[in-house]
A protein has these predicted regions:
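Conserved, structured core segments of small domains
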Residues: 1-114
Length: 114
């Protein structure tokens, strides 16, 4: 299953990392080790964010993915399952059937048929 790893890096730790001349090499090693499909870096709420798209086959892979970010970056780490458009197209018909099975008459009147 495809997951988004979002690592929020505290300012102090981030400042130290970017001053390390080996930082980019270490980051690239992590990306290669976890076989990230994609890696993106951005700012959010004043923090440095690193995000990676990875394939997780089983839950026991999570520590391998997260611990280097906790230990080496002091990051706040979140893991979120994500879908491609093809995944969404595949799952949506059954999701609509399931959602409609829980729908009440009041909800149908308020929201109409979708």
């Amino acid at each position: 299953m495809r997951f988004l790893i979002r690592a929020t890096i505290p300012t102090e730790a981030g400042n130290m990392m970017v001053q390390d001349p080996n930082f980019l090499r270490k980051l690239e090693e992590y990306i290669n080790k976890v076989n990230a499909e994609a890696a993106y870096f951005f700012e959010a709420n004043g923090n440095r964010i690193a995000s990676f798209i990875v394939d997780v086959q089983s839950a026991d892979q999570i520590p391998v993915l997260a611990e280097p970010l906790f230990i080496k970056m002091g990051a706040h780490v979140e893991l979120h399952p994500v879908m491609s458009l093809d995944d969404l197209k595949k799952g949506m018909p059954q999701a609509i059937v399931e959602a409609n099975s829980y729908r009440t008459d009041a909800a149908a009147e308020q929201f109409g048929s979708m």
